[in-house]
Amino acid sequence: MAGFWSKIFGNDEKPSSAQTAKDRLKVIVASEQGLGRRLSQDKIDQMKKEIMQVVSRYVRGVDEDHIQMQVRSEANIEMLEMNINLPEER
């Protein structure tokens, strides 16, 4: 698990494939239970704010505009897709 976090937030090694992918973190939560019916836009907005607060503890310069969340369907499975564009390291 430590390797996962070091890939996301960096370490002293050469740039990883995550760096090559422009420091983009993508998380997908999939469900056959119908996420769209259970997650209102208000709940998605609240999740976005809470996730931003957690990411901001570890990465400077992340704001709400860097986080995109959407519910989409694919092959009878609804997914909550979240993209976080991390700012360039300075």
Curated annotation (Swiss-Prot):
Sequence segments annotated as region (Disordered): 1-21
Transmembrane region(s): none
Keywords, in A-Z order: Cell cycle, Cell division
Superkingdom of source: Bacteria
Xref: SUPFAM superfamilies: Cell division protein MinE topological specificity domain
GO biological-process terms attached to the record: cell division; regulation of division septum assembly
Compositional bias (Basic and acidic residues): 10-21
Family to which this protein belongs: Belongs to the MinE family.
HAMAP family assigned: MinE
Function of the molecule: Prevents the cell division inhibition by proteins MinC and MinD at internal division sites while permitting inhibition at polar sites. This ensures cell division at the proper site by restricting the formation of a division septum at the midpoint of the long axis of the cell.
Protein name: Cell division topological specificity factor
Protein's gene: minE
